[in-house]
A protein has these predicted regions:
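Active-site "cap" helix and flanking loop/linker of ATP-utilizing ligase/carboxylase catalytic domains
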Residues: 247-269, 287-360, 373
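ATP-binding N-terminal substructure of ATP-dependent carboxylate-amine bond-forming enzymes
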Residues: 2-96
């Protein structure tokens, strides 16, 4: 009887645990710390532990065969290093390898060193020099906090005023704390974005299904950036040609480069791609974990045994398997709390949740910022739920997801009404 552990509490981790729960011969999936959604599903059990050493103790005591890490913070804190030192099987990058995400400066220097296509950049920790560089470059221009900032450390400044204000916020105003003590300023890139997520075992790569995220809070990609308001898979802009090019120009050089630099990468590697009108590719960013909300539609389409993929990843044998996908489209819509992406309102009672989080075989509600209070599910974060559905095409998947989403409500609930619009407008 197999026991597994998923580290994290978001929609991505709920989707991982839900998919792992379908494993033949499974006894239990522990989720640390989990949320109200993972608390309510049959084979899942929440455990209130977040400290890496304590998690490793738990895994030893409960004979957990395999652990998978969802979010970036535990990776940057070295949870993989701790588990590996004790001989525990865990899929994810070490603290050192996770710098591809935890430091924008590390990632940009790495890409420059290994000739991986990305936007031209400069790094600053002192605001006078940063302001001067912006005046020299002009707008539009992109300013990124160096450290982890929950997807909110990026400002795409369309004017010089906006660019200077972002520098003041991050470097002088210390709005993002330590994460913003250094900034990376880079050229603005135009084109269509896609999320290209692969599994890496140190040397071999297994590509997962492509997807496209929707970062802005409002319809038509308006308003401030968020952690992501919805996603669908596959992304039609990732044609077979783009796929081959991404593997050849970005993914494989990254995996080889990390190994050559003495920091072999194991885990999920997520390259944010910018696909130019001419078919050129640039790397916008690296994440060293699956995306949220992209994981929800991706895992809804996965037909292969997820545990099998993870075990090959841990054992260094990803070259021996292929992943099989549902040919339908999966589309997920994030339902967010009032006032997100600013400080979200918490504690609102959520109405209309289906039993077992499921609206039938082809529509599922993945929980993120939820908690249980007096037997009821309440909002407990910015992105609260992700309603994900399968359909024969993007339009039908979109229709199914929104038909499910409207059954759920709470005070101030907000969501985008146009997830998937780029694929539909193609």
């Amino acid at each position: 009887a197999m026991r597994l552990l998923v580290i994290g509490s978001g929609g991505r981790e709920h989707a991982m645990a839900w998919r792992l729960a379908k494993t033949p011969g499974l006894q239990k999936v522990f989720v640390a710390p989990g949320n109200a959604g993972t608390a309510r599903e049959h084979e899942l059990e929440n455990i209130g532990i977040t400290d890496p050493e304590a998690l490793a103790d738990f895994a030893e005591q409960n004979k957990v065969q395999l652990t998978v890490v969802g979010p970036e913070a535990p990776l940057a804190a070295g949870v993989v290093n701790v588990f590996r030192a004790r001989g525990l099987k865990i899929f994810g990058p070490t603290k050192e390898a996770a710098q591809l995400e935890s430091s924008k400066d590390f990632a940009k220097r790495f890409m420059a060193r290994h000739n991986i296509p990305t936007a031209e950049f400069a790094t600053f920790s002192e605001s006078t020099a940063a302001h001067a560089y912006i005046d020299q470059k002009g707008a539009p221009i992109v300013i990124k906090a160096d450290g982890l900032a929950a997807g909110k450390g990026v400002v795409v400044a369309m004017s010089l005023e906006e660019a200077h204000a972002a520098i003041d916020d991050m470097l002088s105003g210390n709005k993002l704390g330590d994460a913003g003590a250094r900034v990376v300023i880079e050229d603005f890139l135009d084109g269509e974005e896609a999320s290209f997520i692969v599994m890496v075992d140190g040397k071999n790569v297994l590509a997962l299904a492509s997807s496209q995220d929707h970062k802005r809070i409002f319809d038509g990609d308006q308003g401030p950036n968020t952690g992501g308001m919805g996603a669908y898979s596959p992304a039609p802009c990732v044609t077979p040609e783009v796929h081959a090019k991404a593997m050849r120009e970005i993914i494989l050089p990254t995996v080889r480069g990390m190994a050559a630099d003495g920091i072999p990468f194991t885990g999920f590697l997520y390259a944010g791609l910018m696909i130019g009108k001419d078919g050129s590719l640039k790397t916008l960013e690296f994440n060293c974990r699956m995306g949220d909300p992209e994981t929800q539609p991706i895992l809804m389409r996965l037909k292969s045994d997820f545990v099998d993929l993870l075990e090959h990843g841990v054992d260094g044998t990803l070259d021996q398997i292929e992943a099989e996908w549902d040919r339908r489209i999966a589309l997920g819509v994030v339902l967010a709390a009032a006032n997100y992406p600013e400080t979200p309102k918490k504690g609102d009672v959520i109405q209309g949740l289906p039993a077992g989080n499921s609206f039938g075989e082809d529509a599922h509600v993945f929980h993120a910022g939820t908690a249980e209070q007096d037997g009821r599910v309440v909002t407990n974060g910015g992105r609260v739920l992700c309603v994900t559905a399968l359909g024969e095409n993007v339009k039908l998947a979109q229709k199914a997801a929104y038909e499910a989403a409207v059954k759920i409500s709470w005070d101030g609930m907000q969501y985008r009404k146009d997830i998937g619009f780029r694929a539909i407008n193609r």
